[in-house]
């Protein structure tokens, strides 16, 4: 590569960089002398040398203590990685037999000579850094060791001085039913002949007596220390990580190895760098790290036991695979096995005994034999079958290569592959660039970068990149050592190769749990595992031969504790499941971690209906989906969610029930309901497997319990409780048989209080479950015929009442009512110890109570308290669905710990605390965010690979091409590359690994821009799920999801992707009143979240918004970063989000919806332009079961939606009656073309509204809304209406009198509004607590009734005190003094709080401090109207105005500190009593208030903001209900309140008009639009609305509406006809279009339409009257003058028709000559004008020809009549005898076709000849 003059690589004989030494020798980097790091430093001439130490013959020391040119007997490597037997000098001049990096004979860390930095002292035998012994003297004469190695004495060897060599034997192995004789080795040192007379204890004692264990003497006392000064001990000289020494290389005084265990580093007894197999000890991570071997130690050569390159009998590779006795290279390459590559020949880097990458032996990515850390499997390579390299030859999965050629085209191969695919050909000179990457030049085998072995081949070696070297055949670049010859030249090679094969067979026996050669980690701690099964055990062999589910697969990559996930499988381990399945069974479960093997339960898989041919791989004990994926817990079910039941019988559940495992938690079982079974559960999913996402576990609470492994009771949490079938019928029909449940009162007491009707109505009912919690229902509860077993489910951290929403009664009935829930045992779990945190201090530190409060608020509950002692979480709910603490809630503030796994194009996983609303599950619960697990669990990684031909990549972070945005639950789109790979049958992950190796990371771009579906989502979308691209969806949907849109969309957006059809409706249906705020709603509306939720999937209860604010209108376009569509551009099925704004849903007028997504459930497309039946479509749409994708998603649907169901007639009156009242009090101005309606000034309309609403508030469907309307109109009447008291006065009353009268009227309004609540409270408290009833009367200023009640209850002093209230101010002062005295004497502690409340009220004190540090608040538990009334009546003097009382009340609820706030906020009526917290929107100064409060503010401040007052949310929960808002605005306009902005007014007018239009009252919508001030906007809006609704077919209803528009609203009739013309044009009805255009006075358009479409048909059909009717109407000059081309078009037709009629008239009646003259003139005129008619079609030309022909005949007739024959002749007039001179000029101008023209010519010719004949006579 660099020409021959550069010699070998860095000093080797075949180096790539020269032939002379760095420091002036005759080689560049050292073919004949020491290289840069080679053996000789300054000048001796060698045969070879190199940077990394190829063999040299004359090395010299740095300081030249001995000669610079001592002869050497062998070679040495620069870093000591090769063999070295030549003599050399050490760094400090001590002679040695070979040199390396640190001047010892052997490699750098396993010296046999004194080291440069070793110990300082006497000569002794010591161990190198990695374990080999040396027996030389140190320069300072002391016993020395290697760089870090401990020293040992030179005493006579006793004990185990002879290296362990296991005796061999034979045994029988049964595989696939065939018995095979195999060789065995006895892995016990006492089995050797040398030690067969001794026991293990004796050998150990001799080792101890030989001081092979224990500290050495200090420096200068006969021994030396290591590099860091601690006392090394004699040892058997093993390595840093796998030595059997008792003192570490760093010698800190502990009797441990380098990592502190009593054994080797990674679990082997005498292992190499990373540990050869140790039989009886454990590793750093408490797992055996390899298989037991027969070696003692290795150097740094990753597999050799002696010095570099020397033969060794049995060694371990880098990761512990044993190899036979043979020389080993840097990575343990077995030089006798015709392989010499760096990464996997013999026992190379990854422990293989065969050729490099892709050979039959094993490869880096395609090993066929050896597996993970010392165990072996039989699997096919990923990129090739039997001989392919990483990118190399013969891949079966095909990347387009041919046999024996590499993919990269770097040459051809013949026998083995290097890493880049080229093979050396024996005896050849290489092939170009291909040779540069490994083709040996004259060598038999190439190593990683071209290092060759002196095997069968020519005399020349290859350089680093293929360049030839001439002086040596053993030089390497440092990644391999010179190897001994192969079988042809080495007599030991054959035996070594046989030993290697034997080792492979042994590894199969020793490793029953599989192996992955790519990522090797320590195995689990044997202390926590049962004793390993003996590999030759007949039972084990029988299990191996039983065809089951799993192939040989790796253990979990780390010591994990996977949480038990809910699944249809069982919780039992399956030790030998699937050990001998065929390769196709590996499709989904091959290289995935399996769970604990502690329990051996062999399950008959044939009993389960889960295992269809496609998805049977996905469900078993340790299916990959059961492991926590990056801390998140999901179970990918192969059946619908409602079929997630136990499938294997009671015996499995029993075993699961009593089975606990610290490693694998039992899988909670759920009962199987017979009603939920599906007949299609066995159907095969025939879609592209890689694109099918399975239905996720919808209920995160039921999926797993946090304490499953620690509490027996929690094992039952997610199963139905065992029922006691022996029970007696309750007289009231109440059923409660589940064990552990109780009621207060008890069931017996309930039976006693059952009345004679069989009804059981109990007050303050409680139902609970021992140890779990209870539910307390306040008030009277009717328990008659309630099946509490089915209704109430109290589980760990969860309570469910009414599982089925369809069976849930309305709010307030049954148990769906307000309640107080107490859940016991709610403690968080410590992430480290997995124990419950019960310490109150620690709970306070982590703010667990605050977390529970946040969870309560999120679920719509009101948090009450948390009791750490019992873990009781107490909260109140307004109605029931499901409440509880999910694992995601408990750990939402935890962040997963970082893992230090190898990165392969990774992307960081976002923290779990940034969950977005779109990640909420469809059942209303947020999808569980990632849980913070133990570090071992988190190191498990997130990739779930289910392909058989992929190696273990559980330690790999996920590829960012697999990262997907979190859809509901665990649904993600699939990357395009995955889709392509899966479609072609290629392993997607293989493709991803190739991409990661070749391509750089791509920038994250938004999906709306690059239109790809596999990129990372936006910042807000965290909580990512990473799924395997091959996860089958529900089996029940496989028959519906055939390949429809290329397979890419079907699995993503079928019903299985979101909800199973069997559960979608039942699970999602909830009463709309409870769907959002969990509060009683006053209408069919509930409080909606912000508007953005309309464009997302419907979410059932209880998704509670944290804020309740009014809708805010955006005045401009929302920035893209803040838009709800940001980052959602890839959501194909949601056309509101796909492609950003370009594909957003189009909302049209009249609530029409144009979208290209799926048609909404229940709606109909608008066909034939008829309004389809409206579907129920609330502000939040009803849940819709997603249908399978059966057509293109880009078909546009036009649908008609409505806010509610069709209204009954009486409900429609709520719309029409107030509009009629408004029209009655309005004036229509017709000064302009478009009429303008303005309200009449005055207050008369207010009284009409008030009178009407009082009558209408009876039994209407919307009684609650009308009731609020009544309060509003009566308040307007009190504030601005006529006062009867003032109307009787003749003179204008003074302002003071007006203020007092308004106060009285407002006071009466307050009393009336409080009456219903007061009556209800008095009825509840009159008997038990009359004092409370008295206070209720006082809140309505019903003082006389309060006095009477006090007297009736015997409280005469209170009655007397109440009667004085109407007196002077002195009564209040005296009461205040009395309260002060009681406070000073602390006597108030003995007075009832309710009584003190009355005293404080009468004293005018809203808040009174008691002596016991309590407060009496007179406004507590009062609505805002009564709180305001208290301020007006009791806290202010009688002369105070309304404004002053309102100001004082505002201070009561607006104080910044909670301690000073004593009154409730003026919430709208639909929110009163809901218990919800109203949070003000950030940066908003307009909190939500009641409309009545706004009216009071406007009365007090004339310039108060009208926009707040007219906001619909201040009136009703429906933000689109503008009925009252618009009428209020018109009333305020009549009162001269005109400071509403033009934009807000326009929105108000248009919104109310749209609402009326959607209800079918479009004529009243025009009435509303006629109030718009801007004439242009008004006219445009009215005309557009007319265009949408005017019908061509006249009916009595349409006629009445048109009459209303034209007569009452004075809408121009021509506008209506114009709208009809547009509709006729749309329907292609030309006749009606022309008629409507004529009526709309569009003369020109009408004429144009007639000429182009109607005239020709009329002429051809001789329908002259029809055409004449149109043309005569257009003929008047005032009209025809406005028509273009009237003279040459319409008038020609009209004259033609008139000529025909005149001729008929002349023929019927005798006419004068004047008439004939006129007719002659018209006919001759037509002859010249007919040709001017413009023809647009063949029909027009036909009509023109007919007209010309007929005109020609008319002309003859007229001329014959006008010129009769001579009187002498008796002949009658003959048209054929007309003089030619009169006829020919006109006939020639007529446009006639050829046949007509020929007839006319023939006639003219005959006339001409006749005239000639006559003239000749």
Swiss-Prot record:
EC number: 3.4.21.-
Keywords tagged on the record: Acetylation, Autocatalytic cleavage, Chromosomal rearrangement, Host-virus interaction, Hydrolase, Isopeptide bond, Membrane, mRNA transport, Nuclear pore complex, Nucleus, Phosphoprotein, Protease, Protein transport, Repeat, Serine protease, Translocation, Transport, Ubl conjugation
Pfam families membership: Nucleoporin2 (PF04096), Nup96 (PF12110), Nup98_GLEBS (PF21240)
InterPro entries assigned: Nucleoporin_S59-like (IPR037665), Nup98_auto-Pept-S59_dom (IPR007230), Nup98_auto-Pept-S59_dom_sf (IPR036903), Nup98_C (IPR021967)
Ranges for region FG repeats 2: 214-480
Cellular compartment(s): Nucleus membrane; Nucleus, Nuclear pore complex; Nucleus, Nucleoplasm
Ranges for region GLEBS: 157-213
Major localisation: nucleus
GO biological process: mRNA transport; nuclear pore complex assembly; nuclear pore organization; nucleocytoplasmic transport; positive regulation of mRNA splicing, via spliceosome; post-transcriptional tethering of RNA polymerase II gene DNA at nuclear periphery; protein import into nucleus; proteolysis
Membrane topology per record: Peripheral membrane protein
Chain segments carrying region Disordered: 512-535, 614-633, 662-682, 886-937
Modifications the protein undergoes after translation, according to the UniProt entry: Isoform 1 to isoform 4 are autoproteolytically cleaved to yield Nup98 and Nup96 or Nup98 only, respectively. Cleaved Nup98 is necessary for the targeting of Nup98 to the nuclear pore and the interaction with Nup96.
Phenotypic consequence of residue 808 to A: No effect on autoprocessing. Severe loss of autoprocessing
Site positions (Cleavage): 880-881
UniProt free text on domains: Contains G-L-F-G repeats. The FG repeat domains in Nup98 have a direct role in the transport.
Protein function: Plays a role in the nuclear pore complex (NPC) assembly and/or maintenance. NUP98 and NUP96 are involved in the bidirectional transport across the NPC. May anchor NUP153 and TPR to the NPC. In cooperation with DHX9, plays a role in transcription and alternative splicing activation of a subset of genes. Involved in the localization of DHX9 in discrete intranuclear foci (GLFG-body).
PANTHER family referenced in this protein's UniProt entry, alphabetically: NUCLEAR PORE COMPLEX PROTEIN NUP98-NUP96 (PTHR23198:SF6), NUCLEOPORIN (PTHR23198)
Name of the protein in question: Nuclear pore complex protein Nup98-Nup96
Origin organism lineage: Eukaryota, Metazoa, Chordata, Craniata, Vertebrata
